């Protein structure tokens, strides 16, 4: 399965002002850096949880799809197109309320286009972004614990784990 972001979220779920307050920074001199750290933290946490933290348009492709498959980077997925490699529109069905599954019978090269994402990000995920921004701000080099590189801080992982779809 391959996922491609067509249109990313338009507004980050954490503002620079919120991050500045969390970091106890009183000036705006670091706002550009903080904004970049917010985007980076959100993207890494989205990969960790397999969720979309805001509305975005995505394409997902399966080499072979026969039966039900969970649509990645949800919640609230709305499929707008389902085609095969030849460009033929395929019959499909979805099930699920907040987290959707796609059904397609014995098809190869299936690509769906869909929109997905939280309308309001849960507080724990917002705090996870803030914790990751703080860790990245304080540790601007690679982040190591006991000689091992960590993509996310333990605090951010702990806050996001209960939402993870991985």
Task: Give residue ranges: language-model regions.
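Divalent metal-cofactor coordination and adjacent catalytic microenvironments
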Residues: 1-166
